């Protein structure tokens, strides 16, 4: 029989007592009282914070939105069908955050920052809160650097600056997304990180956008955040905030970011759905009372930081879809009053072949002109004036047939100016080319061309300058202003290009 050694047992017990650690895991938990339509009512978590992340069973997260006296109304971010009444809910004691950093570039993520592009996990140890207070007045500086879109109609007459919020507004199928995507493509090599947030769109449409960005080499500096039409309303509601949080990382590191929200009408509809399910009192058009704050707190985060904070910026291009051109509806008027201007796209212009279909009369940029380069201001000011006069005369000329020579000449020039502002999709132009063709139009150098020949001539002009006088484009880019010598050189080159173009046309007709 084995002998029991008391000293060994004592030694063993002593070592176990010495190494004993008293660990008590304390979680604040509540109970699901009712669940349905992506909304859970939870009892027992009295000390929860507004907007706090809650842990539900089966790995589903929720956000505490309604803090009532005896219960908490939470919205669920994911598949909630497996959650049932009586399930346990834990507090996480943290506000929702998304992963940020260099690893996000080139990726397609959902509203929680999780990758959905089958390219593996995103490896980063940096996180930004989804909701964040916008920079204060002292932390900002005025908009003074241009943010080129590559579109003649916008860069010349409605310029956008870094740190600006410029609304793109119009009916469905007027080219709103195309304007935003042209801006992304034009940002190549300009030290700009682009964040495209797709809210409530068809997945096929988003896949098309991603494919187009890849084909144009734009995914190398872009991030796509997706909350599609099939995602729960809470995901569509937080997607723009997640996109901004991702962009803020680049702004805070002294770089420049562009945020496109496509579109905020669907985010407002998702927020209305959540609010009505949470039994918040409805207001105008059934939207809750704080729907203005929904968009203002989002768009105020786009800013140009002071040099002391690194001088980084976020430029916002929110998109709003109108119904039958009604810009006086609730959400459009809200966002117009928050932003620094709007680009209004019109169905009639789009259908008549004017693309981008920018209505220059209703579009405005409230701060962009202080950011525009001098050369663009020089040609853009006269362009806007001549187009305004043309529209007035065009409306007037419908009533009378006998027009004097001056009026007829102005109408003819207006037709050519409308023609030079047309541009093919995904063909953004550098400032130098835009300035050259607008200079030609506003100085009457295209008046003797047929209207149908204006666009073919524009293409021929760029080719001629690049082969015969490439220094012209370089000089405009470097000096950023037009002096008499540059104007004389431009006039001479444009006239030479026109002579060659007309002689080529004549020869082609003779040969035919």
UniProtKB/Swiss-Prot annotation:
It is found in: Cell inner membrane. It is an enzyme of class 7 (translocase). One of its GO terms (cellular component) is proton-transporting ATP synthase complex. Keywords: ATP synthesis, ATP-binding, Cell inner membrane, Cell membrane, CF(1), Hydrogen ion transport, Ion transport, Membrane, Nucleotide-binding, Translocase, Transport. The keyword Nucleotide-binding applies. ATP binds at residues 170-177. The record marks 363 as: Required for activity. Its EC number is 7.1.2.2. GO terms for molecular function: ADP binding; ATP binding; proton-transporting ATP synthase activity, rotational mechanism. It catalyses: ATP + H2O + 4 H(+)(in) = ADP + phosphate + 5 H(+)(out). InterPro entries: ATP_synth_asu-like_sf, ATP_synth_asu_C, ATP_synth_asu_C_sf, ATP_synth_F1_a_nt-bd_dom, ATP_synth_F1_asu, ATPase_a/bsu_AS, ATPase_F1/V1/A1_a/bsu_N, ATPase_F1/V1/A1_a/bsu_N_sf. It is a peripheral membrane protein. Belongs to the ATPase alpha/beta chains family. F-type ATPases have 2 components, CF(1) - the catalytic core - and CF(0) - the membrane proton channel. CF(1) has five subunits: alpha(3), beta(3), gamma(1), delta(1), epsilon(1). CF(0) has three main subunits: a(1), b(2) and c(9-12). The alpha and beta chains form an alternating ring which encloses part of the gamma chain. CF(1) is attached to CF(0) by a central stalk formed by the gamma and epsilon chains, while a peripheral stalk is formed by the delta and b chains. Produces ATP from ADP in the presence of a proton gradient across the membrane. The alpha chain is a regulatory subunit. This is ATP synthase subunit alpha. It comes from Koribacter versatilis (strain Ellin345). The lineage of its organism: Bacteria, Pseudomonadati, Acidobacteriota, Terriglobia, Terriglobales.
């Amino acid at each position: 029989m084995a002998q029991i050694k008391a000293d060994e047992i004592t030694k063993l017990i002593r070592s176990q007592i010495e190494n004993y650690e008293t660990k008590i895991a304390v979680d604040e938990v509540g109970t699901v009282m009712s669940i349905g339509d992506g909304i859970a009512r939870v009892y027992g978590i009295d000390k929860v914070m507004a907007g706090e992340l809650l842990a539900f069973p089966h790995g589903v997260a929720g956000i505490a939105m309604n803090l009532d006296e005896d219960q908490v109304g939470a919205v669920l971010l994911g598949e909630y069908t497996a959650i049932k009444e009586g399930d346990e809910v834990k507090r996480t004691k943290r506000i929702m955050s998304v992963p940020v950093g260099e690893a996000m570039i080139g990726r397609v993520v959902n509203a929680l920052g999780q990758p959905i592009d089958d390219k593996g996990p995103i490896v980063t140890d940096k996180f930004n809160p989804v909701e964040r207070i916008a920079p204060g007045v002292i932390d900002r500086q005025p908009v003074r650097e241009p943010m080129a879109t590559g579109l003649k109609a916008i860069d010349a007459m409605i310029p956008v600056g870094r740190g600006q919020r410029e609304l793109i507004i119009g009916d469905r199928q007027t080219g709103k997304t195309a304007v935003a995507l042209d801006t992304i493509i034009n940002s190549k090599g300009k030290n700009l990180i682009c964040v495209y947030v797709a809210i409530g769109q068809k997945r096929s449409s988003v896949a098309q956008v991603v494919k187009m960005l890849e084909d144009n080499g734009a995914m190398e500096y872009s991030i796509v955040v997706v909350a599609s039409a099939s995602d729960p309303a809470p995901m569509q509601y937080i997607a723009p905030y997640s996109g901004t949080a991702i962009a803020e990382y680049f702004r805070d590191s002294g770089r420049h970011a562009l945020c496109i929200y496509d579109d905020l009408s669907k985010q407002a509809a998702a927020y209305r759905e959540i609010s009505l399910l949470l039994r918040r009192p409805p207001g105008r058009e059934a939207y809750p009372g704080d729907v203005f704050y929904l968009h203002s707190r989002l768009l105020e985060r786009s800013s140009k930081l002071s040099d002391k904070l690194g001088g980084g910026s976020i430029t916002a291009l929110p998109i709003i879809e109108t119904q039958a051109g009604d810009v006086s509806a609730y959400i459009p008027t809200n966002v117009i009053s928050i932003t620094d201007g709007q680009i209004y796209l019109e169905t009639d212009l789009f259908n008549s072949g004017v693309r981008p279909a920018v209505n220059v009369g209703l579009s405005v940029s409230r701060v962009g002109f202080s950011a525009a380069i001098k050369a663009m201001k020089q040609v853009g000011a006269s362009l806007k004036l001549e187009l305004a006069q043309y529209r007035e005369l065009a409306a007037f000329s419908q009533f009378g047939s006998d027009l004097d020579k001056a009026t007829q000449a102005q109408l003819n020039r207006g037709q050519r100016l409308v023609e030079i502002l047309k541009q093919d999709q995904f063909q953004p132009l550098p400032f130098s080319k835009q300035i050259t063709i607008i200079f030609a139009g506003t100085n009457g150098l295209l008046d003797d061309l047929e209207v149908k020949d204006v666009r073919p001539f524009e293409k021929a002009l760029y080719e001629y300058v690049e082969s015969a006088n490439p220094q012209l484009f370089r000089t405009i880019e470097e000096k950023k202003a037009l002096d008499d010598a540059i104007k004389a050189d431009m006039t001479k080159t444009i006239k030479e290009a026109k002579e060659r173009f007309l002689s080529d046309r004549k020869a082609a007709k003779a040969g035919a």
